[in-house]
Amino acid sequence: MTETLHLDTEIPRPRGDVWAAFADTRSRQQWSVPAGEALVYDNDDFRSGGSAEYRCGAPGQLQFSAIVTYVAVEEQSFAVQTETVWHGDDLLASGLISWFFDDVPAGTSVSIVDQVVSFVGQDMIEGSRNGHRIALEQLGTFLAGPGQISAGASDRDSRPS
């Protein structure tokens, strides 16, 4: 089962600030995980040709693991990566994920295109969609200053988000 997901948001901060929060592993561990879950990078070599490994899931269990290969990274512009996710020895999904960062009058537009293949059905694809939506919203919240409200993410595939 395959699908191409398109999600985006606008964040009222300069592109350099948004990119810094995206590129920094420690920051990414904070904003990219849904509330009530945990994510730990075992390694992250964020550069073209680099790779990363992380575990995520319920705190204390981290039952899912992923391997990432950074295909191409252009600072403050885009990152293209492959990502494969397992639960133990069970292969769940693999995808080609592209993040794009562009200047807009309100700050920075962040877009995600995820060409995902699920080996376990539609729920994994919906989980990817929901995970990206949450990550975009939380990236905006992470970067929002005191008293600021970040914008939500939109799903350009016209599905409820």
Give the predicted meaning of each segment.
Residues V18-F22, R28, A52-Y54, Y70, ...:
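Hydrophobic pocket/interface hotspot
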Residues V40-V85:
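Glycine-rich portal/gate segments that line the openings of hydrophobic small-molecule binding cavities
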Residues M1, D44-F46, G60-F64, D89-A93, ...:
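A generic structural micro-feature
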Residues L7-T9, Y41-D42, A66-A72, G95-D103:
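Hydrophobic/aromatic beta-strand elements that line small-molecule binding cavities or substrate pockets
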Residues V80-T82, W86-I134:
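Beta-strand/loop substructures that line and gate deep hydrophobic ligand-binding cavities in soluble
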Residues V116-S161:
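A conserved amphipathic terminal alpha-helix motif
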Residues R15-G16, R47, V71-F78, F100-S109:
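A short, structured loop/turn motif at beta-sheet edges
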Residues M1-A38:
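Hydrophobic ligand-binding cavity/cleft-lining segments
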